Amino acid sequence: MIVALTGNDNNGAVADLAEELALLRVAAGNRVLLVCPEPCAYDPQLYDDLVIDASHNTTRDAASLAGAAVIVALLRHEDLEHRDHAALLARLRAASEANPGARVLVAVTHGRQPLTPHQTGCLLVFVAQLPGARLADTLVLDHDTYHSYHSALEADAYKTANVLCAPEVRHLYRQVFNTSRR
């Protein structure tokens, strides 16, 4: 499966999230290629999944988004009020038109403070402008590190002694790869 992550240009959190999702996938026993190549330029016999940072708004990234089974759009909370999302919306719409079978998940990062009502409204409007997209999760990103003060809310089935990342990232992982513990 190809999973492409995108966001506004120069959003370093996208590469970090791609790395964490790939790490979780490897920990689940899958072979994962974490690079930013042309989509489908990998041997599916060698890798189960391809996780791509497609956040640089290039022709290659557009092709990566168009070839993905799952597209994760990551927004920063400060982007919700202060940036124009027309370019990102256009890229996501073009990817959806090129690949109508792709699932589009939108996630937002915020610091220790929760989103304001205005930011929440902006986020919902952003998601509503993408046909078939859904809001996946909000991730706590503070000092360039994903972590959580919500871990007490995570189901016991998903808590382990050797967790690789924040509960929100593990929750997003389960949504992207449709996994569940039995």
Spans of model-derived segments:
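Conserved C-terminal guanine-recognition region of P-loop GTPase G domains, centered on the G4
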Residues: 83-113
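Post-Walker A helix-loop "phosphate-sensing" segment adjacent to the P-loop in P-loop NTPases
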Residues: 23-34
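Glycine-rich phosphate-binding P-loop
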Residues: 1-23
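Switch II (G3) loop of P-loop NTPases
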Residues: 35-37, 43-64
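NTP-binding/hydrolysis catalytic cores, primarily Walker-type P-loop NTPases
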Residues: 151-182
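Conserved beta-strand segments of the P-loop GTPase G domain that flank and frequently precede/overlap
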Residues: 6, 35, 50-54, 71-77, ...
